[in-house]
Amino acid sequence: MAWKNGWKAACGALLMLAALSPSPAPAQVPDDVLVVGQIAEPKSLDPHAVTATNDFRILMNLYDGLVRFRSGTLEIEPALAEKWEISPDGKTYTFTLRRGVKFHDGTPFDAEAVKFNFDRMLDDKHPQHDTGPFPLAFFFSAVERTEAADPRTVVFHLKEPYAPLLSNLAYPTGLIVSPEAVRKGGKDYGRKPVGTGAYRFTEWQSNTKVVVERNPDYWNGAPKLQAVIFRPLTDANTRLTELLAGGLDLMVEVPPDAVDLLGKAGGFKLHEQAGPHLWFLILNTREGPFKDVRVRQAINYAIDKEALVKGVLQGTATVADSIVPAAFEWAHDDKLQPYPHDPDRARALLREAGAEGAELKFLVAEGGSGMLAPVPMATAIQADLAKVGLKVTIQTYEWNTYLGLVNQGLAGKGDMAEMAWMTNDPDTLPFLTLRTEALPENGGFNSGYYSNPEIDKLLLQARQSTDRDARAELYRQVQRIVREDAPWAFVANWKQNAVTTERVQGFELQPSFLLNLAHVSKAAQ
């Protein structure tokens, strides 16, 4: 494949240049500073205002939540809350807060601060609600009200039982911001973030870097590093060049061919971690050819997903079979099979639907969180669809521009769009993207306008059930119906990766796809 050979040639040339060039000066990156190569510029440093893992990787180091994911797992453990109790009816969660914690601006972390955070997101009459929008406030839609019972006790009163609450509180949308900083910053708060985390914000130079520095008073022990610099490098070749030249200590989302070549170069460590990731195509079910379920099914048959994961992704992913990634073992339907590659079946469905030779506009990101190799993936998909007679035009966009476009819905913009989600609970992705109430005009992420009342009912039942086995069966029903309705083309589940220099110590990738640098250090030159 031309794209593959081109990337390999580029990587090979970069490695040759690195070998011929003198070694970088030891002072280029100080021993107590970590430089991270990110895939894009962050949209905001307000955890309640963003949706991208690219942004979350920074935010997890500036803020804490009431709870967090235990390292190496998706299990919940205490963070800013020391402990919690759940009422027998599952509708009241009472959290006891950690003593003596302060925000980076010196203001106290207490129950009133927690109440402020959730009221700001959920109450449209709150004085700081206009500092939004808050696209993932859906995570806490079951919360009727929050109560600061005393300075160290905060109570969440729910409208109904809500099984994913603790998991959602551990997600970046549950991170706690300084109320005083929000009041001072207003709509610009996302450029001047203040949390309780291991690092505190120093500066943000647009399209150049975000700098955070060590919080010496961190409640969980001060970091070993003095600072972390996050550099937005959207081009994979540029990230690789910087890594080889000594300008980066850590590179996230490494292209498959680069992984192989970096291994040969020496001096680097590869980190891999499986997690609940899904790469898919959103199909516009409101207008155009994809209004017909037969055309949506045809797309799923036409795309050679095995070739994509083995070729474009070099075996770093598996073929996706449903909306619930297999990483959620307890909820995934193991009996469900991916759509097989069957061009003849695809052509037959297109004939039945009267969609032979249809012209499709395909929206594609140039990069982005979990998007893998979006342009090569799109080019390969375009070729597969051409083989069944479909004429696909690709239009590419910068990541944040792309998110803004696609999240508002595909109507009037395109027929299909790439997307990737990394989730924390089987509820998250379908509830935010496939319910009728999650249409873009309602503030949700159902950008393809899929609507099925049975799915709406099952998802509501699943999130209200406190019996894990009952929830699992409901999610299996959802998977079977969604596979048949085919509102998306299900493509790949990715195993995330990162590369560090051998000097970096204490770094681990997490199944949550988040980046925790509190315990990372660097060996001296």
Language-model regions: role of each:
Residues 319-352, 369-376:
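Structural transition elements
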Residues 498-525:
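Long beta-strand-rich cores associated with HINT superfamily self-processing modules
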Residues 387-404, 431-502, 524-525:
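Extracytoplasmic/peripheral linker and loop segments enriched in polar/acidic and small residues
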Residues 190, 215-261:
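Ligand-site clamp/hinge motif
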Residues 82-127, 155, 242, 289-291:
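Aromatic- and charge-enriched surface segment that lines or borders ligand/interaction sites
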Residues 96, 115, 133-180:
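Surface-exposed binding/hinge segments that line
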